[in-house]
């Protein structure tokens, strides 16, 4: 509801809203005028369907520089590393932990930053729609649900998100092909690193249904001062094989997390580096965090803190 006071008996009102067509109404009466309910028509240009298709390059057949990582390789080599670090051995890919905090890794491909690398999960672009990059801390649980991971180096085109000038990374998650069974695992590492994970799958039933559930928690103190972290991850996949030619699957996954950070932009002078070495004592000076300290009650605090949850829901029809 709104009330407008006009100095003239003639006026033109314009109504605009994102996703709807503009509407113009003229007022020519004197005194109080009731416009009633103002209805805007949908703008078909902005609300049209987006069809996303994806495919995996075939080694020795597709004319693209490509590297494919199988789930066995990821499980054996990843350990307590972050997901992007598994690509360190891939030609043309540079992966680093930046400030060293949980989930703050970044990837450069052929020298290009993440803004020019298309990252997709099941063919759906994950790049941020505003700045084009990607925060890997939002997808901390992807390593536990990945069926295969493929990097394609070289120019690519995208109508939806970031242009893949440097290349593209396509991550395919588990679906109806999972065997019946389950597992519970616990991992631990240095600096209080802990990871608890469970996984269960029904396999495909006689009537074509399959369900896969996965959940876990990762927490620890971090290698760098004041980089404590805690993250949960979940994955749900419900699939139905209608016949030999059609299959429908619903997937939901996410990773609510928080972690303290260390900025990698605040460099130290030579004098400052010497002071840090004296301050840290026998500990490695590489652990020093200038944004870390203690509160009035002795609690550990950090000036840089990140807390986020970016769930993804998708419905796929394969034929």
Identify the function of each model-found stretch.
Residues 3-5, 106, 125-153, 172:
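Short acidic/polar hinge/loop motifs at secondary-structure boundaries
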Residues 14-21, 30-76, 114:
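Short, acidic, small-residue-rich periplasmic hinge/interaction motif at the N-terminus
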Residues 27-32, 93-103, 161-165, 227-230:
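Short, glycine-/polar-rich solvent-exposed loops and beta-turns at beta-strand/coil boundaries
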Residues 59, 84-125, 141, 147:
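Extracytoplasmic beta-strand/coil segments of soluble accessory domains associated
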Residues 96, 156-160, 186-188, 223-225, ...:
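Outer-membrane beta-barrel domain signature
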Residues 131-132, 151-153, 180-183, 217-221, ...:
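Extracytoplasmic loops and strand-loop junctions of Gram-negative outer membrane beta-barrel proteins
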Residues 140-185:
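A beta-strand signature from Gram-negative outer-membrane beta-barrel systems
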Residues 181, 188-219, 224-273, 304-318:
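Transmembrane beta-barrel wall of Gram-negative outer-membrane proteins
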């Amino acid at each position: 509801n709104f009330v407008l006071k006009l100095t003239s008996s003639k006026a033109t009102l314009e109504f605009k809203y994102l996703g709807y067509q503009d509407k113009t109404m003229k007022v020519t009466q004197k005194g109080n005028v009731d416009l009633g309910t103002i209805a805007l028509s949908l703008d078909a240009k902005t609300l049209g369907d987006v069809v996303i298709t994806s495919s995996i390059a075939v080694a020795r057949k597709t004319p693209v520089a490509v590297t494919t990582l199988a789930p066995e390789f990821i499980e054996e080599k990843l350990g307590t590393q972050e997901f992007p670090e598994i690509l360190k051995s891939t030609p043309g890919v540079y992966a680093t932990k930046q400030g060293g905090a949980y989930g703050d890794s970044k990837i450069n491909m052929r020298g290009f930053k993440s803004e020019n690398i298309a990252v997709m999960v099941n063919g759906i672009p994950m790049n941020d729609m505003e700045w084009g990059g990607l925060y890997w801390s939002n997808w901390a649980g992807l390593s536990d649900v990945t069926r295969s991971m493929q990097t394609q180096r070289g120019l690519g085109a995208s109508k939806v998100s970031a242009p893949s000038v440097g290349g593209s990374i396509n991550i395919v998650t588990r679906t109806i092909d999972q065997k019946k069974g389950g597992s519970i695992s616990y991992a631990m590492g240095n600096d209080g690193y802990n990871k608890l994970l469970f996984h269960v799958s029904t396999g495909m039933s006689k009537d074509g249904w399959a369900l896969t559930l996965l959940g876990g928690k990762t927490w620890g103190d971090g290698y760098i001062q004041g980089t404590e972290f805690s993250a949960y991850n979940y994955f749900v996949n419900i699939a139905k094989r209608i016949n030999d030619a059609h299959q429908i699957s619903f997937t939901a996954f996410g990773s609510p997390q928080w972690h303290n950070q260390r900025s990698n932009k605040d460099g130290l002078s030579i004098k400052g580096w010497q002071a840090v070495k004296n301050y840290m004592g026998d500990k490695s000076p590489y652990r020093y965090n200038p944004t870390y300290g203690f509160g009035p009650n002795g609690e550990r605090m950090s000036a840089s803190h990140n807390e986020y949850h970016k769930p993804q829901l998708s419905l796929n029809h394969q034929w």
